[in-house]
Amino acid sequence: MPHRSRLAILLIDLPPHLHDRGQQFWSGATGHPVEPDGIDDHWSSLGSFADGFHLEVQRTGEGTPPRWHVDIETDDVHAEVTRLEALGAVRMADMGGFWQMKDPAGLLFCVVGIQTGEEFERHATTWP
């Protein structure tokens, strides 16, 4: 059965001691104001860019290095994980509803359910 997915979100992962400074830097660099998540203070958004690509900031735990990772959003997490494994990705952790994976070069990314609503509908690729 076909499913859809798209590269949707670039996340800036920052440990607590770097979070506020990094968040303010990227707000200034992009010209987008920080939009705090009203429910979870580990998350904030710097809005969306070309084709609805989102830039988010995530407060990670102590000991996590500052890094970037991308989220691939999909309407079928299992099918997308299976498709990406066939391309050489490796499952790292079942995060309960989404998967943390590594690409063949060892870069971390996540496969998540739909996060961007209408932007997903406009920009997702349909896979057989």
Predicted regions span which residues?
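N-terminal beta-strand motif that seeds the catalytic metal site of vicinal oxygen chelate
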Residues: 1-23, 68-72, 115-128
